[in-house]
């Protein structure tokens, strides 16, 4: 199947979240997917930049979908781990094209591996993806709603921070001002309604509430939304290290999906901490936990400071 939209794609790729994020199918065959997403102001962080989290749903859907298209009908598979190693910076506007290929499938063991790439419209490499999927037997409690083809309303994006808001500040002051609402948190954090609550040098805490639009067919939050939250948090932790005029960029992210948060569950707390900071590279660990303190997601990232 080749398509410029999701109308002819498998149901798993026609869910409301893919439609909301503008993810569309370019090519589909068993074990292989090519998807695309337009990027721009809707998905920018507070700096007005496209980051990995801007295409988190795409990053999850592409390798995950390649595995899903490889298993027998009626078999469910979700990602348990996803890693992304970034090359060139994500484009501020334009298109990001992701390809995913199932590289190993062992139904007896109940798992599979997939790899993929992300490129811009000119073919420039943006990221290399690796993922592990596991077979699940949970009922698809929200499938009828999520896969109905309903198009959710696209919210108006929140503003980015102004140039004057960022100029002349060390990064810690920027993140402090973001937490207090003195500067805008940006469209991507606004989409999640991510509320930064605590800020120290090398440490940031925040929370967000699960929302219905985040659901996958199983009734839990789609992994790409969790990628977005973790990437935003890791970036903010990196920014607390920056001097006036210094920039940061996440270079890689490895995320383990430990437990599946329900879309009707309690608020999720997110914490990111720098575990080592050199002159040019910082190593960051982040966790998403539920109200009882159980780990939902753990992630590790490296950031470049320049």
Regions flagged by a language model, labelled:
Residues 17, 29-31, 76-78, 94, ...:
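Residue-level preference for beta-strand/loop junctions
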Residues 9, 20, 32-66, 211-235:
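Hot-dog-fold acyl-thioester-processing enzymes
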Residues 64-97, 235-268:
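Hydrophobic beta-strand-centered segment that forms part of the acyl-chain substrate-binding groove
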Residues 32-34, 81, 95-97, 113, ...:
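Intrinsic-disorder/low-complexity, polar/charged segments enriched in Ser/Thr/Lys/Arg/Asp/Glu/Gln
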Residues 65, 77, 90-93, 103-168, ...:
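HotDog/MaoC-like acyl-thioester-processing domains
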Residues 1-42, 140-211:
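Non-catalytic linker/capping segments at the edges of enzyme domains
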Residues 178-260:
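Structured core of small recognition/catalytic domains
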Residues 19-24, 81-86, 190-194, 252-258, ...:
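Short structured motifs
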């Amino acid at each position: 199947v080749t398509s410029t939209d999701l109308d002819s794609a498998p149901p798993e790729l026609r869910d409301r979240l893919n439609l909301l994020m503008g993810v569309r199918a370019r090519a589909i065959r068993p074990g292989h997917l090519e998807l695309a997403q337009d990027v721009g102001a809707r998905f920018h962080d507070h700096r007005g930049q496209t980051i990995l989290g801007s295409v988190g749903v795409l990053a999850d859907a592409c390798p995950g979908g390649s595995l899903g298209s490889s298993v027998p009908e009626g078999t469910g598979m979700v990602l348990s781990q996803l890693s992304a190693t970034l090359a060139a910076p994500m484009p501020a506007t334009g298109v990001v094209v992701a390809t995913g290929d199932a590289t190993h499938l062992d139904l007896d063991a109940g798992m599979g591996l997939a790899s993929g790439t992300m490129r811009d419209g000119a073919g420039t490499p943006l990221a290399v993806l690796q993922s592990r999927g596991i077979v699940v037997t949970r009922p698809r409690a929200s499938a009828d709603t999520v896969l109905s083809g309903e198009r959710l309303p696209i919210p108006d994006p929140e503003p980015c921070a102004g140039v004057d808001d960022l100029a002349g500040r060390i990064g810690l002051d920027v993140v402090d001002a973001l937490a207090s609402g003195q500067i805008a948190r940006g469209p991507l954090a606004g989409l999640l309604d991510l509320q930064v609550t605590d800020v120290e040098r090398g440490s940031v805490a925040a929370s967000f509430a699960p929302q219905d639009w985040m659901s996958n067919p199983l009734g839990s939050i789609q992994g790409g939304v969790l990628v977005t939250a973790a990437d935003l948090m890791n970036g903010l932790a990196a920014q607390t290290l920056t001097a006036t005029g210094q920039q940061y960029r996440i270079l890689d992210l490895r995320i383990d999906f430990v437990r599946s948060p329900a879309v009707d569950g309690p608020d999720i707390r997110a914490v990111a901490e720098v575990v080592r900071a050199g002159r040019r590279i910082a190593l960051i660990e982040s966790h998403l936990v539920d109200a009882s303190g159980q780990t939902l997601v753990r992630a590790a990232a490296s950031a470049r400071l320049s």
